Amino acid sequence: MLILLDQNGVLADFEHAFIDAWRKRHPDIEPVAFEDRKSFHIREDYAPELRGLAEAIYTAPGFIRDLPPVPGAIEAFRELLALGMDVRICSSPLMQFENYVAEKYLWVERHLGREATQRLILTRDKTLVQGDLLIDDRPVITGAARPRWRHIIYDAPYNRDQTDRPRLDWRNWRNVLAGELYRSDA
């Protein structure tokens, strides 16, 4: 089984690192709490006059490279490989890619090892990537093709209105994926 894992928000803890960076840069302005997030795009949860400040954080050199892992993500990645799954990291860089692309590779190398960089797929359109499952925090994924993979939502406050697909986090991933493996054998 080919499992595609999104990077930011699934493997790399973008959300909490953003809040920490916001507090350091703008101690006089309260950040939007993670549990209060409504939009997949973090800048859209801020007032228009604050969106440039938000964007300056996540496009800053070193931000993506220095993201901490989501708790349990590294262990789950390694366990899936040990179970014989073909696991790939499928990530969409921002349009402001100057730092993003290299830093995504550096993040993978730092947390998963240099060999894992060969498992990194960067694309603006995930529907063009083949796989059996895509675990992604983006609530709706559209593109040029009808995807072959089944979208499993990685749980986040901004995607909880989507109830038509399986949902997981790194605490319950074994149960959710066991159901998907059974389903694929049927």
From Swiss-Prot:
The keyword Nucleotide-binding does not apply. Its EC number is 3.1.3.-. One of its GO terms (biological process) is pyrimidine deoxyribonucleotide catabolic process. Pfam families: NT5C (PF06941). This is Putative 5'(3')-deoxyribonucleotidase. Dephosphorylates the 5' and 2'(3')-phosphates of deoxyribonucleotides. Signal peptide: none annotated. Keywords: Hydrolase, Magnesium, Metal-binding. GO terms for molecular function: 5'-nucleotidase activity; metal ion binding. It is an enzyme of class 3 (hydrolase). It comes from Bordetella parapertussis (strain 12822 / ATCC BAA-587 / NCTC 13253). InterPro entries: 5'(3')-deoxyribonucleotidase (IPR010708), HAD-like_sf (IPR036412), HAD_sf (IPR023214). Belongs to the 5'(3')-deoxyribonucleotidase family. Its cofactor is Mg(2+).
